[in-house]
């Protein structure tokens, strides 16, 4: 979606450096448990966050780190709510969540779409393959579903925080 109006992109190196700098600063101040919660479900973006987390684990001996996207939590925890298989950007999940909080931002009439990019080939003009910016079925969205999704995401995040706090890594390697 980097070619869409309103999108601000940063280089992966910048994202990694920013995350590492923030976590290291907080670690120096005494924090030890870190949940990196991303609102973006892009594969490259998440790979960078995981890579930064792995680097931080090797540099900060007492740190515990979890990396998760709120979208993954919504998809995993909302299995009984979500009707669309393969739902993603501006689809059922995202449209429902926005309908629950900022309904005026949801464009009416968005149609179901599942873009097909060339397999294994990187493309410059992503809009040629993904003209609508929709990946999923926004017609199945509702404000009520969005509120329920928000609840399950918060519950899952609370469980993750507790799990991370209680996590004891096995010794040795």
List each model region and its residues.
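Extended, histidine- and acidic-residue-enriched regions that form the cofactor-binding/catalytic faces
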Residues: 1-35, 39-173
């Amino acid at each position: 979606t980097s070619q869409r109006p309103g999108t601000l992109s940063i280089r992966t190196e910048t994202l990694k450096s920013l995350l590492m700098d923030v976590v290291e600063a907080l670690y120096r101040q005494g924090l030890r448990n870190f949940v990196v919660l991303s609102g973006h479900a892009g594969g490259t973006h998440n790979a960078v966050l995981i890579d930064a987390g792995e680097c931080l684990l090797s540099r900060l001996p007492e740190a515990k780190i979890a990396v998760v996207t709120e979208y993954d939590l919504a998809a995993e925890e909302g299995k009984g709510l979500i009707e669309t298989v393969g739902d993603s950007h501006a689809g059922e999940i995202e449209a429902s969540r926005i309908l629950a909080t900022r309904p005026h931002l949801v464009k009416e009439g968005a149609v179901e779409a599942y873009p097909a990019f060339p397999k294994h080939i990187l493309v410059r003009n992503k809009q040629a393959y993904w003209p609508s910016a929709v990946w999923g079925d926004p017609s199945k969205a509702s404000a009520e579903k969005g509120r329920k999704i928000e609840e399950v995401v918060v519950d899952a995040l609370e469980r993750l925080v507790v799990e991370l706090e209680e996590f004891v890594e096995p010794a040795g390697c």
